Amino acid sequence: MGISRGASKLIASTLGESGPRRRAITFGVQRVETDDGREIHQDELFGRLGFGTVESIDYYPDEKPTHVLDLNLPVPADLRGQFDLVYDGGTMEHCFNAPQVMRNAALLAASNGLVIHHVPMNNWVDHGFYQFSPTLFFDFYGAAAFEDLQMKIHFVARHRESYLPYDPRIDLPVPYVAGGRRKVLIFFSARKTASVKSGEPGFPIQGRYRTTFGGERATSASAVRKTFSGRLRASLRKRFFGWGARVL
């Protein structure tokens, strides 16, 4: 998809001031749109963000990735736990074995490293194999003991980009028609902690069924109402059909 100006701002704000910035790795090799309309290589962007080394993984060698690998398969042992940032800027939807792509992202991250997935959510028919639901990322990385799980719904319409914070654990479900005619993406991040077990993460059970049938305690209804009314419900129609989202 390339890294848009809005995506660059989301990456920078997510990185913030915390965490080491030694090595970053990306899925795919992408061009980055700048504010003055130019394009730069992704290595320049991540270098500006403080990373000393920027590596990449791709299936084909054409764009000169650092590692020519198939993300449908487990990544080699010598790459595991080595990266302070793992950035998937729209590769996962093109891989048939999407769960393994997420496992690989988790495996590549170092302790205290950050994983970011920026992938299609709605209105991307036939762009790749899949469009994704927010609960997939919260349930997978939650089950893998990652922390600081955050997501923004990223709206793209021509040259206008905007976003809304969203958390399926406390917010009510997003309407199926979210975004109207705009393209909608998930911008999700999670941090790997020392408590994350070594080896490949397992398969999660979807959160709604863990609470309905598995005895897991759900977030209280009052908390849902409070959070939802503050962030989503009060302006649902406006926000999802053209107004109220934060402009990038």
Region locations from a protein language model:
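Class I SAM-dependent methyltransferase Rossmann-like catalytic core
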Residues: 1-22
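A short alpha-helical cap/connector motif
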Residues: 3-6, 159, 238
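Amphipathic alpha-helical segments that form well-ordered structural scaffolds
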Residues: 10, 136-140, 189
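Conserved SAM-binding loop
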Residues: 22-31, 36-124, 135
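Flexible, glycine-/basic-rich loop-and-beta segments that form/coincide
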Residues: 158-223
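Membrane-proximal basic amphipathic "stem/tether" segments
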Residues: 210-248
